[in-house]
Design a protein with these regions (language model features):
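Conserved N-terminal segment of class I S-adenosyl-L-methionine
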Residues: 177-181
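Residue-level detector of conserved catalytic or cofactor/ligand-binding positions
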Residues: 202-208
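Carrier-protein-dependent adenylate-forming modules in NRPS/ANL systems
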Residues: 1-175, 185-186, 208
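Gly/Ser/Thr-rich phosphate-binding loops and adjoining beta-strand/alpha-helix segments
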Residues: 55, 190-194
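Short catalytic-loop micro-motif centered on adjacent basic/acidic residues
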Residues: 82, 194-195
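Short glycine/serine/threonine-enriched helix-capping/active-site loop
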Residues: 69, 195-196
Length: 208
């Protein structure tokens, strides 16, 4: 039985490594490349973070690189919290103060914004983390700390009725939904899926 979302990536990277996994206006990333990049990011985070199953904020523009960062957080044994880089800085600061994340990983495009939060949590650059050589032993130890009922990600509500609330979703919930959804819709490896929703919007995880 599948227990971790990363198993989807790992199985696919072995089966069709050179097939494009994600494409944006600037970059095409194969499943092999996505696997390598996310493991490198996971290694960089895992070496610096003392514990697992903690929230790690991902602050970046919507891109292939952000996908690698989200998966990299999972490889580090933690769960990701995507925030919209277009949010007002005051809102981001309020969410960080509420969440108290283990770290924030950001892209170069939002480096100045991320730097303003340096007093709230450790900061990691996605671009620098991408240069990290994956450490299989470290990644294995991180994986062993995570159960299928542990969080995979957290999405904040809009806060229209007050302070935004964090909704936690486990690996098991996403696995069960994904297996049902792909069978019900009849998605195959030949299909190409598009996404227009921000990564911090919950519709992204149910309507691709």
């Amino acid at each position: 039985m599948q227990k971790n979302l990363l198993e989807y990536l790992e199985k696919t990277a072995k089966r069709i490594p050179e097939t494009p996994a994600f494409v944006d206006e600037c970059t095409t990333l194969t499943f092999f490349g996505l696997h390598q990049q996310s493991r490198g990011i996971g290694t960089a985070l895992g070496r610096q973070l003392a514990s697992c199953n903690r929230p790690v904020v991902v602050l970046a523009e919507r891109s292939v690189q952000m996908v690698a960062a989200l998966l990299g957080v999972l490889y580090s044994g933690n769960f990701y919290v995507p925030l919209d880089s277009q949010m007002p800085p005051q809102r981001v600061e309020a969410l960080l103060s509420q969440l108290q994340p283990a770290a924030l990983i950001y892209s170069t495009a939002v480096e100045a914004l991320a730097a303003s939060f340096s007093g709230l949590c450790p900061l990691f650059s996605i671009e620098q983390a991408l240069d990290t050589e994956p450490d299989d032993a470290l990644l294995s130890r991180c994986r062993q700390q995570v159960l299928d009922v542990d969080p995979a990600y957290m999405i904040f509500t809009s806060g229209s009725t007050g302070m935004p609330k964090g909704i936690i979703v486990s690996h098991r919930s996403v696995i069960d939904f994904t297996d049902w959804f792909t069978e019900a819709i009849g998605i195959t490896g030949a299909d190409i899926l598009g996404n227009q929703a921000p990564f911090c919007f919950c519709l992204l995880y149910t309507s691709d």
